Design a protein with these regions (language model features):
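Cell-wall glycan-active module
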Residues: 1-216, 220-221, 226-297
Length: 297
């Protein structure tokens, strides 16, 4: 989805293109704990979570996001060129990858047909998005979603994250913009963190066990946590929305597309626009449609 830039391809490219971040694991989580408590989370439960050794401050997500936003705003030359991103996506078009997606489609044909009947989203589109998002559910992210979102939420002050930025990234010209966007993204992450904690509690999941993408998207369909209560579907009717189980994740994906304008017998142009609502990258949308076309052949 749109916040993921947030998916594994760009995450891996970012990690290669950024300077080496100083390691950091210690943080004073008190402001975040107090904020969550003020928002009616159980203080004891929240403190117990943050006291666990698995909770570490990770500056990489906010660092990447600020770099992305500043470069876009001030049109700086970025090391991540469109050609590199397109080359990364091109691997989804390899014959062996398409063959694996075709096998997945056949194996899950009954579930996928149910999705098409309910939402008019072709099974090839569902499988194509799943392939690009998580390689058919095999790669769910290489970091904990809780640490990512908590670290971003704690980084509302630019000075918290400045030591982990390239020295020449924030200039006198861009500093006010950087401070504003840092606050905005921290507030956004805080909302996602609250949703993640609720999701974990409602589903009996250890919040620290949930893997996530660069910016905290979770599940085989890669939803940001706030989207689960809006678009999540309990397809297997077990009383919970489990985005790590195929029926729920795939139906939720289709429900998201339907809610953003997907209709039966849409033109390719309109399909493209709806897919952009799932992820704002044009290369992403191009790849999804190309893979879907190949799956029909």
């Amino acid at each position: 989805m749109a916040r993921r830039l947030k998916f594994s391809i760009l995450a891996s490219i970012f990690s290669l293109s950024l300077f080496i971040l100083p390691s950091s694991s210690f943080a004073d989580w008190t402001p975040l704990i107090e904020r969550l408590t003020a928002d009616n989370f159980d203080e004891q439960v929240i403190r117990e979570i943050f006291d666990r050794p698995g909770v570490n401050f990770d500056p990489s997500a906010m660092s990447c996001k600020l770099k992305e936003l500043i470069n876009k705003r001030y049109k700086k030359q970025d090391t991540i060129s469109a050609s590199k991103v397109r080359a990364a996506y091109a691997r989804f078009l390899k014959p062996e990858v398409i063959a694996a997606a075709q096998t997945y489609l056949q194996k899950n044909r009954e579930t996928l047909q149910g999705i098409t009947d309910a939402y008019c989203v072709p099974k090839e589109i569902v499988v194509s998005i799943l392939l690009v998002e998580t390689e058919l559910g095999r790669h769910l992210g290489d970091r904990g979603a809780f640490n990512t979102l908590a670290s971003m939420a704690l980084s509302s002050d630019l000075e918290t994250i400045r030591p982990y930025l390239a020295p020449d990234l924030v200039t006198r010209r861009s500093e006010e913009f950087a401070r504003k966007r840092c606050r905005q993204k921290a507030d956004w992450a805080y909302g996602e963190l609250k949703a993640l904690i609720r999701y974990a509690s409602e589903n009996g999941i250890d919040p620290l066990s949930i893997p996530g993408s660069l910016y905290g998207a979770i599940g085989i369909c890669q939803f940001m946590p706030t989207k689960i209560s809006v678009y999540g579907v309990d397809a297997d009717r077990d009383g919970r929305v489990n985005l790590f189980a195929e029926p729920d994740a795939l139906y939720s994906m289709a429900n998201y597309l339907r809610s953003h304008g997907w209709r039966c017998d849409m033109s390719a142009k309109r399909q493209y626009r709806v897919i952009l609502a799932y992820n704002h990258s044009k290369i992403y949308a191009d790849t999804v449609l190309t893979v879907a076309k190949k799956l029909k052949e």
